[in-house]
Each structure stands twice: as structure tokens, then as C-alpha cells.
Amino acid sequence: DRDPGEALLFLGRMSPDKGAHRAIRIARQVGRPLNIAAKCREPGEIAYFEEHVEPHLDDQIVYVGEVDHDAKCRLLAEAHALVVPIEWEEPFGLVMIEALACGTPVIAMRRGSVPEILDHGRTAFVADDLSGMAAAVARVAELDPAELRETADARFSVDQMVNGYIAAYEAMIDG
């Protein structure tokens, strides 16, 4: 069950493309705490963390480390919103779908697959820049958690994905 708090959530991998440093800027701009849950094992990830994230950690900006499934679900349930400030053409952002499945609002940068996965103003807020993402934080109460879950189930459930693959294979076979 969803019990949102005040904190925003960044969930991903420690890299400039994923943008934990941008999530920090958003959290600071709107005056909200931020939990950062991210994989940070590779040399590049560690270097990025040490240079761009670690200097900003305090009682409001917290790095919780890499998390397992149960911890991820708990963080999503407790988050005010998931922020996805990507700076690359993300081919498929599973974390956005996981958030929707939990009924957690998503605020994402309009890059890659984001506009295909998220429906701006209905299931999420999609922005063109960090200012737009920050402005969307105040609007997440407009999104209905039940509708977010229903959308995730209707579009991305295992049955839906399997049926989509079958249809694609049948179309290829039929030429």
C-alpha cells in the first residue's frame, strides 16, 4: 500500500546519463528531501558519485545505496514522486513502469522512450527541462494512484507484453 511522504526518489544507476546530480538540484529547488537508491559498483559509477553526488549528501539528500526488490518497493510506496532526470535516449525505462505499478507519480525528462511510456498529465509529468520537472513536483497530487496502477497493468503486465510479442511474431511470419 502506498503511504507517500515528503521525499522524492531517484532510482537507477550512478551515471551522468541517469542524472542523480540533476535530481539533487530539483530536490533543492523545491525544498524536498531526496532518497537516492542507485547501483554504484563500476569505476565510472564510483567516480561520478564521488564528484557529483557525495559532496551534496546531508540529512535531506540521502544515498541509500543499491537496493533489493523489497526495499525498492518500500521506497516507491513512500516516495512523494519518482524523478527521472535522464540526459540520454533511454530505450525503455523499467523503473518508470515499476513506479506506476506502485501508484507512485513519475516526473521525467522528455527523452528517449519517456513520452511513449508516460502520459503527461494523466499518469505522470513529462518535462523539457529541470525547471519543468521542479514545477511538476507541486502537481503530483493531481495524479490518481489507482489510475497509475491500472495503466501499468493494462499496458505493461506480463500478459500484455506476451500478447504483444505474439502479435509481432505473427506479423513477421505472415510477412
Enumerate the predicted regions with their spans.
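Conserved donor-binding/catalytic core segment of Leloir-type glycosyltransferases
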Residues: D1-A37
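Nucleotide-activated donor-binding/catalytic signature segment of Leloir-type glycosyltransferases, i.e.
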Residues: I36-A38, E50-C73
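A short, well-ordered alpha-helix in the C-terminal region of glycosyltransferases
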Residues: R139-V158, G164
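C-terminal "capping" alpha-helix adjacent to the active site of nucleotide-linked donor transferases
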Residues: F125-E147
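Short hydrophobic beta-strand element within catalytic cores of glycosyltransferases
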Residues: A101, P105-A108
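Short acidic/histidine- and often glycine-rich active-site loop of Leloir-type glycosyltransferases
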Residues: R110-G121, F125-A127
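Acidic donor-binding loop of glycosyltransferase active sites
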Residues: L8, A77-P91, T104
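Short glycine/serine-rich donor-binding loops of glycosyltransferases
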Residues: G93-M96, V114
